[in-house]
């Protein structure tokens, strides 16, 4: 049997354990002709351990209207905000600092994000996360 033909890839950010047919999930999957409730059930089951976090998900749609999906780790900015208890980052990150983060906290976040980052080792991953912190107005402590 030949491999199924990929028709489309859909990228969404959905809150873990709370996928439902309402926007943004419903319209995006409906346009591709997918069974929305089937995706919601599978996604909620697979992501129930990470409730409360927004997870990026890449849905691959095939020509026979079947699908597969991959959940990725939460965005770095979301993990940084959660680690230091922020609501939002700074509107002017270079002049107005909104918090501080330690190297240990950066390493925890980097370990979580490691599989999705373009980094060879933990130090490179920490530097990537530190850059995200600086662009949010968070001071990185040595």
Swiss-Prot record:
InterPro entries named in the record? Ribosomal_uL11, Ribosomal_uL11_bac-typ, Ribosomal_uL11_C, Ribosomal_uL11_C_sf, Ribosomal_uL11_CS, Ribosomal_uL11_N, Ribosomal_uL11_N_sf
Q: Which GO terms describe its cellular component?
A: cytosolic large ribosomal subunit
Instruction: State the Gene3D superfamilies in the record.
Output: Ribosomal protein L11, C-terminal domain (1.10.10.250), Ribosomal protein L11/L12, N-terminal domain (3.30.1550.10)
Which superkingdom heads the taxonomic lineage of this protein's source?
Bacteria
Q: Which Pfam families match?
A: Ribosomal_L11, Ribosomal_L11_N
- MF terms (GO), sorted A to Z: large ribosomal subunit rRNA binding; structural constituent of ribosome
Task: Alphabetically list the UniProt keywords.
Answer: Methylation, Ribonucleoprotein, Ribosomal protein, RNA-binding, rRNA-binding
What function does this protein fulfil? Forms part of the ribosomal stalk which helps the ribosome interact with GTP-bound translation factors.
UniProt record similarity statement: Belongs to the universal ribosomal protein uL11 family.
Matching PANTHER family: 60S RIBOSOMAL PROTEIN L12 (PTHR11661), LARGE RIBOSOMAL SUBUNIT PROTEIN UL11M (PTHR11661:SF1)
Put simply, this protein is called: Large ribosomal subunit protein uL11
């Amino acid at each position: 049997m030949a491999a199924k033909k990929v028709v489309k890839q859909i990228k969404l950010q959905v809150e873990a354990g709370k996928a439902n047919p309402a926007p943004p999930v419903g319209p995006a999957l409906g346009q591709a002709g997918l069974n929305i409730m089937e995706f919601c059930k599978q996604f909620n089951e697979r992501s129930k351990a990470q409730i409360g976090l927004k997870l990026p998900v890449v849905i691959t749609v095939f020509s026979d209207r079947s699908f597969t999906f991959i959940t990725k780790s939460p965005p770095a900015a979301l993990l940084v905000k959660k680690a230091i208890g922020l609501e939002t980052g700074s509107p002017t990150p270079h002049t107005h600092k909104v918090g501080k983060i330690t190297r240990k906290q950066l390493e925890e976040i980097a370990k979580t994000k490691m599989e999705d980052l373009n980094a060879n080792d933990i130090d490179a991953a920490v530097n990537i996360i530190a850059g995200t912190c600086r662009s949010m107005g968070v001071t990185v402590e040595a």
